[in-house]
Amino acid sequence: MSEVANEASRRRTFAIISHPDAGKTTLTEKLLLFGGAIQMAGSVKGRKAARHATSDWMALEKERGISVTSSVMQFPYEDKIVNLLDTPGHADFGEDTYRVLTAVDSALMVIDVAKGVEERTIKLMEVCRLRDTPIMTFINKLDREGKDPIELLDEVETVLGIQCAPVTWPIGMGQRLKGVVHLLTGEVHLYEPGRNFTRQDSTIFPSIDAPGLAEKIGAQMLADLRDELELVQGASHPFDLEAYRAGKQTPVFFGSGVNNFGVQPLLDFFVEHAPSPQARSTTGREIAPEENKLTGFVFKIQANMDPQHRDRVAFMRVCSGRFSAGMKTFHVRTGKEMKLANALTFMASDREIAAEAWPGDVIGIHNHGTISIGDTFTEGEAVTFTGIPNFAPELFRRARLRDPLKLKQLQKGLAQLSEEGATQFFRPLTSNDLILGAVGVLQFDVAAYRLKDEYGVEATFEPVSVTTARWVHCSNEKKLEEFREKNALNLALDAAGHLVYLAPTRVNLQLAQERSPDVRFSATREAAHTVSVG
């Protein structure tokens, strides 16, 4: 096996998806704790306390207690290297999450035991479906009262349309929680509350018939457990590796992230069964991870990860070959050579200079506005990875400055923040308005907060008469020019210089489409759809 193939086979790159408040960030922390990446987990609820969750690193996230940008964290576990991409659970940041899901090989879905399958979980699951992403499920907050576990499995199967294969099973819940049974090994892991900040090794009995177990959990509970296990094993699906890898079955685990309980069996199972990096489609051909030449694509851009340095970092998923510090690469969209000096690896916002990276790893590339979401890097081949979209925003606001002298900073701030992809910045052809588009209201708050915090600009966002936006394309230059002249009042350029039609009403958009049949109006733009051939 070549070195590239060997390193690729050790990688496990995944994202955690959930509805807000299902405990995703807490679980992220605990996985890092068990992976030895951090010594003490920062509880996400104790916001006023000094311990902030490692993965919620932007000032605004620390203040509000919600994950707004996806973090990337790497940690070793046993003989594997795990790359964990945390995603925002908040609905307004769905695009960021969507793009993160293009960069992973599998996902972990977190469900709150009391609430079951929630609306955001359904949406994220649809995205995973499009790519047949393998999914494991962690039913969280077992230390609280919740729905009946059999009911929950039924809900996941019915609402999400995926087969469930329970791997661990709870012994009680809430006040009566005693532990979980591992259905594949037969082991019983006892629950011992109150040791939730440091790694704990729970007491393990080899089976439900082990002497001493009845004293620990009570004879009646043990008898009930036997009946329940018989029922569960008769009614549920056994774990099937092929079905899981094809995205048709989800192995299910129960636990309590905040109490570090049930996390270790999940992590052990995950590193053993989750897929290593897979082949990926490009405009030219499929690229296998074990190929010797480096390829990778950018799925996220983050401005100001280090407020002292006003920097922008492009997150690149390595798809094949080996990255080594300072190597020269071919930036496919621009057709230029680019030296990747000082690339970073991440442990949330703790960065280290990457000496090397392998398929499945995510590296950060310093960026001064030359890299866009969806860009592909190779060692010379002109191919582009496909399937990384930009969505048309659904809400629009006009930026209004408190201090007109800070116009330059405002333009720069809006352009840089829009590079991250959660908001989009439009400049109308016929006015000096600066229009920001987003998929949710929270993003305008975030933009205003970050403009003030990171760029020193006080701006407010006010309503503007735009209902929807469409990217405009036409292969006939003359017809496009005519369209521009006739519709100049409704046209704008996005941050990347693409022509966009800003429609005041849906009817207006419909009329424009009918009047210009040669012009293509699209609601999404493939993030790097232009390829320069060197």
Swiss-Prot record:
PROSITE patterns, per database record: G_TR_1 (PS00301), G_TR_2 (PS51722)
Gene: prfC
Gene Ontology cellular-component terms listed: cytosol
Protein name as annotated: Peptide chain release factor 3
Record-listed GTP binding positions: 18-25, 86-90, 140-143
Family: Belongs to the TRAFAC class translation factor GTPase superfamily. Classic translation factor GTPase family. PrfC subfamily.
Molecular function GO labels: GTP binding; GTPase activity; guanosine tetraphosphate binding; translation release factor activity, codon nonspecific; translation release factor activity, codon specific
HAMAP family: Rel_fac_3
